[in-house]
Amino acid sequence: MLRTVTSKTVSNQFKRSLATAVATPKAEVTQLSNGIVVATEHNPSAHTASVGVVFGSGAANENPYNNGVSNLWKNIFLSKENSAVAAKEGLALSSNISRDFQSYIVSSLPGSTDKSLDFLNQSFIQQKANLLSSSNFEATKKSVLKQVQDFEENDHPNRVLEHLHSTAFQNTPLSLPTRGTLESLENLVVADLESFANNHFLNSNAVVVGTGNIKHEDLVNSIESKNLSLQTGTKPVLKKKAAFLGSEVRLRDDTLPKAWISLAVEGEPVNSPNYFVAKLAAQIFGSYNAFEPASRLQGIKLLDNIQEYQLCDNFNHFSLSYKDSGLWGFSTATRNVTMIDDLIHFTLKQWNRLTISVTDTEVERAKSLLKLQLGQLYESGNPVNDANLLGAEVLIKGSKLSLGEAFKKIDAITVKDVKAWAGKRLWDQDIAIAGTGQIEGLLDYMRIRSDMSMMRW
């Protein structure tokens, strides 16, 4: 008995009741005397460090005639010649474009900040003309045209999402595809890239970011000592703001095996006070994949009808936010093309519930899912992804919410908030529709539009 008691006493002395909390990197932002904004998130446990420039101009800053110029700049930065030079220095390159921003990132081992900045400064910022040699430009353009053609022919879900933007934001900046079109890319010349860079790659429209194992003061000192200088100028302002228009675009193709459909209402811009409410509302319905057994057990009411009648192969609800506007809706793919009308009807009837009968349980479940999603995004462990996220948020908001701050905002959302948001954004609101494949069963626009409300008495 004595031995047993002693054993328990000793074991309790060394037993830990809680795991050590992992500190989330905190964003630090500094504006230098030359106008350059520097933002970092230091993660001392990271095995790499990423340094780059994020510009607040993406596809939305293009026009129908130079659409795709950002995509060309991205691929020129990542060209074989430039990547080979970087590899010799022990560096890796990455670039990303969206509708609101584009980034050019150099990754290295910790302690190589100066080397990364030297490469970024010499090969891109100060000597962009070297990247635009005739042979390099034509080779990159040919490669991009092939990529876009492959996207148009094979990536049906994302192609439909691009068409959803084009119809929802007709004749406004957000309507332009991020990759460009075959027609616009074919007509681009070196002068188009030079003009875009001169107007948008400016210190007033940029954030120099550092993520991973790199300290804020080290990056600031390196930038000042290396005389990193971006072209000066006034930050460009979009002449036309995004405006949502209820409309549709259909590309019926009965040779395809399925129907791909996206449907959305106007969503929330990034700086909206209802940004997280919209995100949470999308998580109430979440996503579904008919071929994953666990996906069928989520407790989403919409799945009762979808599984009983096998209405779709998958769906995903989204809340996409941009500077001026956003899209809130869902994308789906289905082989059951004779029951598309039922799929849309049951989905929109569930949307109606957000205004009149969403429950506390559904909201709490959505909070958990949204926090999990944000946690995975904020703590991805990938400095390149962190750099893109940091730069995009600092450009639009001037800072970046910590994970704890984001969680507090999510926890503060109530059922009343969701109902109020849905009453404003969903109930009896115009919709945008895009579809391709076997969409004969996607019936008349006004029939679908009438499902955005219901008789409550």
Swiss-Prot record:
Residues 1-26 form a transit peptide. One of its GO terms (molecular function) is metal ion binding. The keyword Transport applies. Component of the ubiquinol-cytochrome c oxidoreductase, a multisubunit transmembrane complex that is part of the mitochondrial electron transport chain which drives oxidative phosphorylation. Component of the ubiquinol-cytochrome c oxidoreductase (cytochrome b-c1 complex, complex III, CIII), a multisubunit enzyme composed of 10 subunits. The complex is composed of 3 respiratory subunits cytochrome b (COB), cytochrome c1 (CYT1) and Rieske protein (RIP1), 2 core protein subunits COR1 and QCR2, and 5 low-molecular weight protein subunits QCR6, QCR7, QCR8, QCR9 and QCR10. Present with 19300 molecules/cell in log phase SD medium. Belongs to the peptidase M16 family. UQCRC1/QCR1 subfamily. This is Cytochrome b-c1 complex subunit 1, mitochondrial.
